[in-house]
């Protein structure tokens, strides 16, 4: 009943997200606009409409349930729209959740480019993707953030992180990773805008939601 974005009575009654909602926050001096979308298959159309306006997506996967059929559907939609994607394995605090097995499942069912960003081992593998990344890794033991952002933007890496959202476990790590590595679409030379949602306020006035491009 205290959900910040699930404000519609139907959402509160059913305990799920039905309508996409927007929130704004600042993290590590970076302004972030969050679009929360439904994860339920019955409302996938609402989710699909937001994809073209995203710089990047966070795909939440249950650590207990793993990759489901709708997870794969959402993954295909994200790839079709070429949305750079971060994955958050949720509920990993519960008994029986095997992180290594879940990572193998993600690589097998979604993409072999899913990379565990909870440590630093992923850098060694990512370094092989380009001469610039390899040179930096060999000389400094790290890869510049802009090079990592390029790999993510080109869908050559899909960062995976673990946590338990209800307990805020892993959320700070996720936000830090987004602030450092999430790519941003370049602005167009001419003014433009893309509408992704039509809604109405409490007085019935029509609201048009858009992203300026």
Predicted regions and their residues:
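Structural and coupling elements of P-loop NTPases
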Residues: 1-213
């Amino acid at each position: 009943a205290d959900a910040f974005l699930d404000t519609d009575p139907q959402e509160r009654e059913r305990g799920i997200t039905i309508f996409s909602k927007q929130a704004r926050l600042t993290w590590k001096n970076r302004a972030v606009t969050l679009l929360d979308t439904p994860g339920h298959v019955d409302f996938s159309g609402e989710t699909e409409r937001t994809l073209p306006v995203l710089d990047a997506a966070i795909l939440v996967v249950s650590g207990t349930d793993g990759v489901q059929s709708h997870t794969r559907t959402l993954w295909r939609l994200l790839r079709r729209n070429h949305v750079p994607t971060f994955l958050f394995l949720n509920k990993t605090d519960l008994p029986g959740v095997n992180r290594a097995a879940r990572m193998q499942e993600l690589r097998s069912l979604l993409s072999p480019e899913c990379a565990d960003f909870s440590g630093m081992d992923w850098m060694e593998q990512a370094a092989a993707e380009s001469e610039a990344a390899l040179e930096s890794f060999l000389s400094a033991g790290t890869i510049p953030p802009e090079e990592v952002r390029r790999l993510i933007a080109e869908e050559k890496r899909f960062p995976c992180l673990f946590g338990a959202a209800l307990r805020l476990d892993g959320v700070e790590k996720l936000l830090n990773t987004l602030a450092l590595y999430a790519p941003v679409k370049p602005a167009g030379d001419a003014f433009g805008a893309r509408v992704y949602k039509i809604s109405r306020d409490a007085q019935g006035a029509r609201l048009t939601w858009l992203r300026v491009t």
